[in-house]
A protein has these predicted regions:
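Contiguous beta-strand/loop segments that form the cofactor/metal-binding neighborhood of enzyme cores
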Residues: 182-277, 310-326
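A short helix->loop->beta-strand "cap" motif at the edges of active sites that frequently abuts
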Residues: 14-16, 94-96, 121-123, 233-237
Length: 341
């Protein structure tokens, strides 16, 4: 998210001030070091500045401190999954447009409450489903809409991440979420985006073996089955298999693919092996995704590119222009996000 904000500022030559909600000094130091490193790499001088608000994890404290003498133009919520609802509700009640990293919330009733609140206050909520900006999936959407694969019959996806994600990266809150809400939900939205269909029925099965043996009470893997209804009232099946107990020696952080099969053809998107690998004497073979979020050299500085960056840039553009009636179809508003909750 920070690379996206800095890149947007650099490209558009717009001054931005970032207000960061912080719980502890250690987090502030980590942010400062990362910010200064990226600012120097991108060569943006003082276009972007920041300040901290120490709020002890309370969204109410954050708003009460900030609203004394400032005005927030846009909010981005990138925090543990189980906190999304509280912070989203507080910012919307303060009439601050927000972008929430997926999932919107962990419970449908929470998402419905946010939807109604957003509608009543006329304050937009977007969900950061960055895969909508992936050119593979944009091509899949166009192909589907042209009718190239006919009537959809079924879709399947396997999406996995390394063990280090639940064991190390998210250990402090991993038990309060699950692998499907954190990861698999991406491909629920992919079907919504590509086909425009509506979910009608859902069922899921999960297993707890490896992580429970490490004292972590959450699912290793969840297999989800969703029945979708198209705008033409035909039904098709989606299967999403997700886990976060992949070997740490995997050639990429994420293994992922997307397949959509119809009566006249099929669309196959290989989203891990994108044709770029690197092997050195010091590291195993790594599968590189050059399309997500990568930093590339320019003449005297660097720039971030990729669909992860485009998602943030698109949100900031929409907020600054306030043209919500003519949104890019890739922007996921809260109404569309309800399908993935």
């Amino acid at each position: 998210i920070l690379p996206g904000i800095l890149t947007f500022s650099k490209i558009n030559k717009i001054s931005i001030k970032i207000i960061v909600a912080i719980n502890k000094l250690e987090s502030a130091n980590t942010f400062s070091n990362k910010f200064n490193q990226l600012k120097d790499l991108l060569g943006i001088d003082d276009l972007v500045k920041y300040e901290f608000i120490f709020c002890n994890g309370s969204s109410k404290n954050f708003i009460s401190q900030y609203s004394k003498n400032n005005k927030l133009v846009a909010g981005i919520i990138s925090i543990p999954d189980h906190l999304h609802f509280e912070w989203s509700k507080t910012l919307i009640e303060a009439k601050i447009p927000i972008l929430v990293v997926k999932p919107l919330t962990l419970k449908l009733e929470e998402s419905n409450e946010l939807f109604n609140l957003s509608k009543d206050l006329s304050i937009p909520i977007f969900v950061e489903f960055h895969k909508r900006f992936d050119r593979q999936l944009k091509y899949a959407k166009d192909s589907f809409m042209k009718g190239l694969i006919g009537i959809p019959l079924y879709s399947f996806t396997e999406y996995t991440q390394r063990k280090e994600v639940p064991l190390e990266n998210f250990r402090s809150w991993v038990e309060k979420s699950n692998i499907f809400s954190y990861l698999g939900v991406h491909y629920v939205d992919v079907i919504k985006y590509v086909t425009g269909s509506t979910p009608k029925r859902v069922s899921a099965t999960g297993q707890k073996y490896f992580l429970s043996s490490k004292g972590i009470n959450t699912f290793d893997s969840i297999q989800c089955n969703i029945i979708w209804e198209t705008n033409n009232k035909t039904l098709f099946n989606q299967i999403i298999i997700s886990n976060w107990v992949e070997s740490n020696k995997s050639s990429a952080m994420s293994k992922q693919d997307f397949h959509l099969i119809g009566t006249s053809g099929r669309i196959d998107c290989e989203q891990k092996e994108r044709g770029l690998r690197i092997l050195t004497d010091t590291n195993y073979t790594e599968e590189i995704n050059p399309d997500f979020t990568r930093i590339f050299s320019q003449k005297e500085s660097f720039i971030f590119e990729g669909y992860g960056i485009d998602s943030i840039k698109n949100y900031l553009h929409n907020i600054l222009n306030q043209d919500f009636q003519n949104l890019d179809c890739r922007a996921c508003n809260i109404k569309e996000a309800l399908s993935s909750t």
